[in-house]
Amino acid sequence: MPLKPNNLCSIALLLTAITAIAFASDKPQDKPTLYVAVNEPNNRMVKADEVNLPLTDGLNIVIATHGWIEREQWPKNLAFDIRDKVDSNEWVCGWFDWRNEARVVNPRDAAHFARETAGKMLAEQILKISNNPRHIHLIAHSSGCWAISEAAKIIAQKTNANIHLTFLDAYVPLGWDANSLGDIPAEPNKIYWADHYLTQDITGNVTYCRLAHAHNVDIGEITPGLKDHRFPFHWYPATVLGKYDPNDKYAGEKLYYKSGNLKYGFARSLEAGKANWEASLKLPTGNNIIKLAKPKEPFDPFGWLFKNKSN
């Protein structure tokens, strides 16, 4: 008997979970932990509560975090990449590790922990770094989007920080309200904006969701090869570097990140420049999904002939 689409999605998710758990490495912390990048010694990540930072107002903070069962060290690497682009006297760059709690068979359980617990812990640890930060940029993939959304809500209540959320293919479990992601109360003295980079894979619309409180951009068509739920966390760091990292699975592939003259990804952040951020604030949220596409190659009826001769 042929399998129904819902059954295929369930099987695909289960196989992903089994594979990821089997090959997971780099032991996570026993409890969710915030790390920040430090220059000395040895250019490394240190637990935020062990860093000798003065508790100060006016800091800019950017934090990346993962989603359900992820082996890749992309949040840590992204924090280092951004740190290399900004003034370290003005920015704190780091990543939030809750992998121990994300290593569960059901992604719904990971999203539940992210929403109910991890977000609060992330907010608490950020506010230990700065009582009243100037600007907060939180970046997350999949289930982790619930953690940064909840953290942002707490930070918005307790500070006057400008808040930027970057959702990488947010996962919204069946029955959950997608409109609660990034639903930050609007106040005259606060600035909030979010971008959401989404795609589809073999699970169909499991993560393909337009968010009401984010600027929605479909990057599926610019994926090198098959569309992949994990592609956004390979793509976004590449927009920081201007190319895919030499150690990335997409190393050497062409990077696309424009819609017309507008650049997406890292270019939409304050880290990329004040003018970039101010331009982002003019982009609508809850928009019809914008689709990035590879530029069409000019038609060359004899191109195949010369290509064959060169081979």
Can you say where each PLM-predicted feature lies in the sequence?
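A conserved mid-domain beta-alpha-beta active-site/ligand-binding segment of alpha/beta enzyme cores
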Residues: 223-241, 245
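Proline/glycine-enriched tight loop/beta-turn segments at coil->beta junctions
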Residues: 54-60
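A domain-start/cap signature at the N-terminus of enzymes
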Residues: 25-52
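Bacterial N-terminal signal peptides that target proteins for export
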Residues: 2-11
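Short, aromatic- and cysteine-enriched interfacial helices/patches
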Residues: 3, 301-309
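Active-site and glycan-interaction determinants of carbohydrate-active enzymes
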Residues: 244-259
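Serine-dependent carboxylesterase/thioesterase catalytic core
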Residues: 60-68, 72-81, 89-98, 103-224, ...
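Bacterial N-terminal signal peptides
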Residues: 11-20
